[in-house]
Swiss-Prot record:
Gene3D superfamilies (alphabetical): q2cbj1_9rhob like domain, Rabenosyn, Rab binding domain
Protein name as it appears in the record: PKHD-type hydroxylase Smlt1146
Organism: Stenotrophomonas maltophilia (strain K279a)
Cofactors required: Fe(2+); L-ascorbate
GO molecular-function terms, A-Z: 2-oxoglutarate-dependent dioxygenase activity; iron ion binding; L-ascorbic acid binding
One of the protein's GO biological processes: DNA damage response
Cofactor binding note from Swiss-Prot or TrEMBL: Binds 1 Fe(2+) ion per subunit.
EC number: 1.14.11.-
Fe2OG dioxygenase domain boundaries: 78-177
First-tier enzyme category under EC: oxidoreductase
InterPro entries: Oxoglu/Fe-dep_dioxygenase_dom (IPR005123), PKHD_C (IPR041097), PKHD_hydroxylase (IPR023550), Pro_4_hyd_alph (IPR006620), Pro_4_hyd_alph_FE2OG_OXY (IPR044862)
Keyword Oxidoreductase: yes
NCBIfam families membership: PRK05467.1-3, PRK05467.1-4
Amino acid sequence: MLLHIPDILSADQVADFRRRLDAADWTDGRETVGHLGAQAKHNQQLPEGSPLRRELGEIILVALARHPLFFSAALPLKYLPPRFNRYSGGGTYGFHVDGAVMNLANGEQLRSDISCTLFLSAPYEYEGGELIISDTYGEHEVKLPAGDLIVYPSSSLHQVRPVTAGARVASFFWVQSMVRDDVQRRLLWEMDGSIERLRQTGGDAEAVLQLTGVYHNLLRRWSEV
């Protein structure tokens, strides 16, 4: 499921992030990938051990926990903590698929079900830099307002087009969902949204209760926790 979730961060939060990131020390993004990935990746990242990366990442995780649309769509179980990258001067990342299993700092592993990009640069601040996500329906071009999030299946082939002017700053992270199957997650998300709309419009209380029960029984059947 490809989903645009607006306003994860407020304008004030984005401005604070940018002020601090613009003054940060960045490293070559190729240091964080294997040999094949290094051939396609041309950007900068905050170092893995950066205190700033951890601090800003925690702010993002708190914001996500407060966002009902994100929870409904992702049904998150684990996160690979947010990282930060910057593309400028022709920086790009060619077509690739994210790794299936990632190592967490606590020694556990994460299955990458959902890939997330949180835009921290406004579209007018840079040229190029579109996130291109390829699936069975074709290619989708994504370039969102600062503070907005795009989520998509980690199995998707995707790339970042070259940034030919300005700088594209973003955070990116992965989620292991309670429901690994993307089709099942989408069905649950659609049902959850329908139940909420029925509640808001004064739908039949008994029918809403029954649908809510169906939702939770499907979640119980499909979830892995």
